[in-house]
């Protein structure tokens, strides 16, 4: 029976673009797909990338042997809202991705037809929203970021000031003027004033490059808990000695991990690496029908740019 299988993945694909659904899903039809490793359910694979700062690297979702009709419909849709939820049958299933579908492809592999959805969180909102701004001379960088996020805003994206940790730098006498997309405006500001921004689960985040982890629940990856698979230091190749500046961690799939937030390592084999780190890059690699069910983390020591 299907309920004997522990891994579970749900994929929901809306008929409407993500940036047109800020008021909810009313008026949209949704295709819901499910896989759990059993032969009578779909095989679903995904590689989900989450970065801090935003690098606009698409994630991919692969679904095996969809109907010809559904494959045809997916080929016509661009910008559709996509949600992925995953977890274990004996624990709550967690939403791990919300974003826009950029495009879909189909290929035959042996007896299977594989549909690949390429998706990106916040892509539609950040690219569709136009930004024309001139700041006041006494405005701070954080003031302007919040102003951009509120007007023109990012449709469908949640903005909470507590997720924006930027120093109160002033523009001074020169002010600041920009015309373009919201994404380009934020990229220009971040490159000049030393902060990173990203969108995860349709929530906006920004942090100074030296601010450390954003406030929130720290996730522990531990030998004792059985979720740690591998941990290796990231070393700078200094002329006189190798100096650790971060860590790479491979764990069992851990949906609570978030880019920009803290992860704590508790390794019995490498206790010298045990401490808290700031997650820079995070990738979830999962497959309902193979051994792949992991999370891969690149994280920095606090204070490392």
Which sequence ranges carry the predicted segments?
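Charged- and aromatic-enriched interaction segments used to assemble
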Residues: 109-224
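Assembly/oligomerization scaffold segments
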Residues: 1-116, 288, 292
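Extracytoplasmic/secreted envelope proteins and their assembly/folding machinery
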Residues: 98, 142-146, 183-187, 232, ...
């Amino acid at each position: 029976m299907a309920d004997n299988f522990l891994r579970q993945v749900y994929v929901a694909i809306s008929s409407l673009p993500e940036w047109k659904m800020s008021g909810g899903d009313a008026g949209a039809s949704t295709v819901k797909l499910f896989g759990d490793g059993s032969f009578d359910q779909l095989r679903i694979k995904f590689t989900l990338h989450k970065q801090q700062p935003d690098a606009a690297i698409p994630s991919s979702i692969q679904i095996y042997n969809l109907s010809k009709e559904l494959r045809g419909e997916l080929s016509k849709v661009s910008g559709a809202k996509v949600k992925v939820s995953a977890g274990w049958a004996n624990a709550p299933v967690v939403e791990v991705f919300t974003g826009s579908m950029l495009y879909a492809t189909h290929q035959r592999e042996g007896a299977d037809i594989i549909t690949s959805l390429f998706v990106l969180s916040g892509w539609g909102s950040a690219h569709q929203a136009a930004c024309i701004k001139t700041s006041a001379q006494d405005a701070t960088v954080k003031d302007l970021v919040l102003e951009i996020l509120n007007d023109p805003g990012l449709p469908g994206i949640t903005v909470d000031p507590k997720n924006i940790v930027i120093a109160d730098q002033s523009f001074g006498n020169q002010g600041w003027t920009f015309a373009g997309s919201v994404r380009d405006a934020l990229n220009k500001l971040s490159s000049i004033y030393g902060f990173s921004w990203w969108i995860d689960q349709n929530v906006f985040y920004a942090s100074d490059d030296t601010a450390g982890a954003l406030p929130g629940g720290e996730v522990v990856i531990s030998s004792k808990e059985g979720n740690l698979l591998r941990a290796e230091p990231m070393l700078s190749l200094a002329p006189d000695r190798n100096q650790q500046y971060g860590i790479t961690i491979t764990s069992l799939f851990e949906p609570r991990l978030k880019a920009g937030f803290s992860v704590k390592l508790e390794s019995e084999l490498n206790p010298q690496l045990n401490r808290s780190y700031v997650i820079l890059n995070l990738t979830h690699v999962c497959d309902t029908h193979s051994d792949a069910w992991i999370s891969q983390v690149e994280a920095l020591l606090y204070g490392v740019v």
